Amino acid sequence: MSCETENLDIKYLPVNPGTAVTKITFSSETPDLVSVYEPGNSGGRRRCFVTDATVATLPVMEHFISKFEDGSCGNDILIILGSGEPYKTIDSVLEIVSNAIEAGFSRKDLFVGIGGGVICDMTGFAASLFKRGIACQFVPTTLLAMVDASIGGKTGCDFKNYKNMIGEFWPAEEILIFPEFVKFLPECQYRSGLGEALKTGLLFDTELYDIFKNDSEKLLQADSETIFNVIKKCASDKAKVVEQDLTEKNIRMFLNLGHTFGHALETVAGLGSIAHGD
């Protein structure tokens, strides 16, 4: 037999990154996650809720948290992680995965991140890993997460003092935004979210920029109507970019304005010591 070289190509359909569509709901109502999710009444789709110690103690979360005795409510479970950037680690991500495994979750179930960018990023990353992919939803509780971090599918965690070094593009199937969470933020986190929103205005939206220019006093006073408008504009602007370039090969790279220097500064200062939007 003569020597031959043959090739075989395997053709793949586009891989669905968690969901084909992300539904974003904006609500001016007081957050009532018991009414939204009805813990213990999952309707056949179990939920793994993930939050942090700070969010879990908010007054608007008290009723929801109380439903989970010993971390479970019916077939649903609740995981409360440490708060802030120091806990944005692969160990925290694997803690979510481990709890879902121990509770017998399947690929048809759901992970729900309730918190700021750290919780949303880690919950989404854990969802992408669990059984090679489970759906996720987010309830962002910081302004930064509402205008940026929860939107667009970037998930991950820090690793060896490198910010967001490992992760996956895994968009949430639904994002529920309650701007009222903003009133519970410390000033530094509120300012951080405004910084991210201003960046979006500078890049893509003159109307958004004009809000910062003309309504600065209302923003500084956290006027609810003004903040609601800023959040909706940022979400819409980012959605348009992500629809064109989910995996950041082109136009989405513009959203990294300030991030190269900013991430380096955060790393040198010690992750968590400087707010991301600062």
What are these regions (language model features)?
Residues P14-G18, F125-E217:
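A glycine/threonine-rich phosphate-anchoring loop and its flanking beta-alpha core
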Residues G82-G84, I114-G116, L257-G258:
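Glycine-rich beta-strand-to-loop/alpha-helix junction loops that act as flexible
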Residues S2-L110:
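ATP/NTP phosphate-donor binding region
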Residues E102-K108, K131-V139, A269-D278:
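Phosphate-handling active-site elements
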Residues D215-D278:
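Active-site segments that bind and position negatively charged phosphate/pyrophosphate groups
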Residues V118-F125, M146, H263-A264:
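Short glycine/serine/threonine-rich phosphate/pyrophosphate-binding segments
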